[in-house]
């Protein structure tokens, strides 16, 4: 790795966590990851749930975001799924779950695990953050899908 800082020889000393390091770490963990926008964003699918791995514009905050882009009409589904997201956020610290309406009028649900990397992360911390982002993202999306199934009378796929 050709970087403008010293990379420690141990796994516990923090050092800058940039996009390339995150992608390399995810791949070293045995996961496939496709770069969507060089230096900014990558995508993967874990347990049939799409994820976006990205940094904010300043390169400080790492986001590991799980997505459920349902085909549910936002107008009818949003109250139930907003309440579900609110319940999750009250009971769990991570990830933050929220809903958004697509341009087509369907409802999307997002579970965003954010890590402040300003002071750097050790290799151990980075692996833990990635693992936590993936596992809690999967749990959050599954929670919302199960709740939607009950509240809206959907099948297991989360579709009407």
Where are the regions a protein language model picked out?
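Short, internal acidic amphipathic alpha-helical interface segments
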Residues: 68-112
């Amino acid at each position: 790795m050709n970087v403008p800082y010293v990379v420690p020889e141990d796994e516990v000393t923090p050092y800058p966590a940039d996009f390339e390091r995150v992608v390399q770490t995810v791949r070293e963990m045995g996961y496939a990851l496709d770069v969507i926008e060089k230096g900014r964003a990558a995508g993967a699918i874990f347990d049939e749930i799409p994820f976006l791995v990205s940094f904010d514009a300043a390169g400080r905050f790492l986001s590991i975001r799980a997505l459920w882009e349902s085909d549910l009409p936002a107008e009818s589904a949003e109250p139930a799924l907003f309440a579900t997201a609110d319940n999750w956020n009250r009971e769990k610290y991570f990830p933050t779950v929220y809903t958004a309406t697509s341009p087509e009028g369907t409802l999307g649900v997002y579970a965003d695990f954010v890590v402040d990397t300003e002071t750097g992360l050790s290799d151990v911390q980075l692996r833990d953050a990635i693992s936590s982002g993936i596992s809690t993202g999967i749990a959050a999306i599954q929670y919302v899908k199960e709740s939607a199934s009950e509240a809206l009378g959907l099948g297991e796929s989360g579709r009407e």
